């Protein structure tokens, strides 16, 4: 139990730093755009570049962590993060920023599937959903809860270019802790000798994985589109001041953290599929309310909180328990990497680029149409999921001791 707590804690801290790197730029974008003369379409390009690199890294490095063990991939990703996060502040224009975000996206994407599988391996069966929720919630808690408030405070004292460098030292500390705490696990030789293509083909033979890849696209379109464009919507369309915008933006991280903690834990008790369907309906309804909230800061905060309360739980269940429980243990990170790759490439990459063009051509006020449409698609597809909650767990919670 003590080892489980230490492992989940350090993996959660690492994913929190990944979240800061991913979303720090969204809160600062209005300031960066003014300095570098960027437009709405450029938001989509910068955000999409990181997501595409994240997708490629998740696909390859997830499979690599199944072969070489989690620790090497996790520590390597954290070292790249720590050494290069400050480079975002050195960019002189759009292309420089895109190139830096591509490299950072590769580090972030490498960390993600390995950290999910390491969390599941460290967790007792009856605590999988809860522990994945704890580990995953830090992405948005740190990146969209803590970071907007920290940025609003730091920009009073330092230039936006320096803000990125503040998080380099914490990254090095977490890398050292990861090396000390996370064990080096090795799989059987026959798994290491198989090709990556054979592993990808193997995981895609499971119907749940095929459905989950498209669902991840839907959930990430909602997350990335709102986190990237809501600051501009609030400032340019609703005419809020920067402080009010930062307060509203913090609701994304707080709501996502609460939902990621509570709903996967609930799925340990009532099943994965019912929670997925409930959360999809909830997120869709809250997006509709958000679109009609006007410039009412408390209402904007509450509706955006609830959108991500539900949506981030969907992401967590998709890449965590649903993915891991649909394939053999030896392919957990590979399956997670495939699902993340498709979701990031299309939902985090191309979809957000499309959203940038929607904002440019139709106006920033229309930006919520795309995530609403993808959530409706997600609800339809979620009916095709097969329940994966372990039978042993169902027996434990029914008061029945599983047969040995």
Language model regions located:
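C-terminal transmembrane helical hairpin of 12-TM major facilitator-type secondary transporters
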Residues: 272-322
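Glycine-rich segments within core transmembrane alpha-helices of 12-TM secondary carriers
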Residues: 130-148, 340-351
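Helix-breaking motifs and short loop linkers at transmembrane-helix boundaries and internal kinks
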Residues: 37, 69, 90-96, 239, ...
């Amino acid at each position: 139990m003590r080892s489980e707590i230490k492992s989940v804690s350090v993996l959660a801290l690492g994913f929190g730093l990944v979240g800061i790197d991913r979303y720090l730029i969204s809160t600062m974008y209005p300031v960066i755009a003014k300095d570098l003369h960027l437009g709405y379409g450029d938001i989509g390009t910068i955000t999409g570049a990181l997501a595409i690199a994240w997708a490629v890294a998740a696909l390859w490095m997830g499979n690599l962590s199944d072969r070489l063990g989690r620790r090497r991939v996790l520590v390597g990703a954290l070292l790249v993060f720590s050494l290069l996060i400050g480079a975002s502040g050195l960019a002189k224009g759009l292309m420089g920023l895109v190139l830096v975000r591509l490299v950072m996206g590769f580090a972030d994407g490498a960390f993600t599937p390995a950290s999910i599988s390491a969390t599941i391996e460290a967790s007792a069966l009856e605590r999988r959903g809860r522990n994945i929720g704890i580990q995953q919630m830090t992405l948005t808690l740190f990146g969209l809860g803590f970071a907007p408030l920290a940025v609003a405070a730091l920009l009073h004292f330092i230039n936006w270019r320096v803000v990125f460098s503040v998080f380099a030292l914490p990254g090095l500390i977490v890398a050292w802790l990861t090396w000390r705490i996370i064990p080096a696990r090795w799989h059987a030789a026959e798994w290491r000798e198989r090709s990556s293509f054979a592993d990808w083909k193997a995981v895609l033979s499971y119907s749940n994985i095929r459905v989950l890849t498209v669902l991840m696209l839907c959930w990430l379109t909602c997350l990335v589109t709102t986190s990237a464009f809501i600051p501009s919507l609030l400032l340019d369309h609703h005419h809020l001041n920067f402080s009010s915008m930062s307060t509203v933006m913090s609701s994304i991280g707080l709501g996502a953290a609460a939902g990621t903690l509570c709903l996967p834990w609930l799925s340990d008790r009532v099943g994965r599929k019912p929670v997925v369907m409930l959360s999809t309906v909830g997120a869709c309804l809250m997006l509709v309310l958000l679109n009609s909230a006007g410039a009412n800061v408390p209402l904007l905060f509450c509706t955006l909180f609830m959108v991500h309360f539900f949506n981030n739980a969907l992401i967590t269940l998709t890449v965590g328990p649903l993915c891991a429980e649909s394939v053999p243990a030896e392919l957990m990170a590979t399956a997670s990497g495939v699902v993340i790759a498709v979701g990031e490439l299309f939902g985090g990459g191309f979809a957000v680029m499309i959203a940038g063009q929607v904002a440019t051509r139709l106006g920033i006020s229309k930006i919520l149409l795309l995530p609403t449409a993808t959530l409706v698609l997600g609800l339809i597809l979620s009916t095709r999921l097969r329940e994966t909650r372990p039978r042993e767990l169902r027996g434990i919670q029914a008061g029945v001791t599983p047969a040995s």
